[in-house]
Amino acid sequence: MLARRIIAALDIKDGRVVKGIKFKNIRDAGDPIELAKRYESEGIDEIVFLDITASYEKRKILLDLVERVAEEIYVPFTVGGGIRTVEEAREIIRRGADKIFINTAAVENPSLIKEIADLIGSANLVVAIDAKWNGKFWEVYTHGGRKPRGMDAVEWAKRVEELGAGEILLTSMDTDGTKQGFDIPLTKAVVDAVNIPVIASGGAGKPEHFLEVFRIGSDAALAASIFHYGEYTVRELKMFLAKNGIPVRLD
């Protein structure tokens, strides 16, 4: 059984981390490099940077940041937010990111998935899916969770795999930010429907939540606030998982 991955998420705006971060002994909680190094030293497996500025003029700030991160940290990192073209994807990889993710652009132009996968390789392409239960099915949302699309998230996940995505980053809008646990029914439905790795996201509040989501077959789990606020360190979380029989990297 492959080691399960713990992934930290950082929201970036104008090259700075946003969302409250209360780490002790960090001089500048807004500096992505400093936070990334902190996570790396704690044993994080991967880091995801979501660029929420994502306006065209600001893209250079993001590209410069990608270069700096690549120089300073060794754990794999993924970059996304506003990527709409094959060229943008290639440039981010060229600057040193290990993977990129797309979301809205994939829904609006599904052939982009295949084009990017053909160019940079499926292993380097993650498709992010934001979903919310609408009473009948889990509906796909785009534009940062603002726009419902009328599409079934489980069916979309299958299509994304067929088109060449190497991984799915699945966020439940119902549990996101609640700290009450991951959305187990949604995550299980997607995990059971596809053969590519699924990263569960939205709702992590304590180590038991990670255990739950790994037990239903998630390959990785992503969290932000649980780590940002220093409630649990990555190492504490991994020790807990290892004790409970989940394979994790502990070096």
Swiss-Prot record:
Protein name per Swiss-Prot or TrEMBL: Imidazole glycerol phosphate synthase subunit HisF
Keyword Chaperone found: no
EC code: 4.3.2.10
EC primary class: lyase
Species: Pyrococcus furiosus (strain ATCC 43587 / DSM 3638 / JCM 8422 / Vc1)
Catalytic activity field: 5-[(5-phospho-1-deoxy-D-ribulos-1-ylimino)methylamino]-1-(5-phospho-beta-D-ribosyl)imidazole-4-carboxamide + L-glutamine = D-erythro-1-(imidazol-4-yl)glycerol 3-phosphate + 5-amino-1-(5-phospho-beta-D-ribosyl)imidazole-4-carboxamide + L-glutamate + H(+)
Family note: Belongs to the HisA/HisF family.
Chief localisation class: cytoplasm
The organism's place on the tree of life at top rank: Archaea
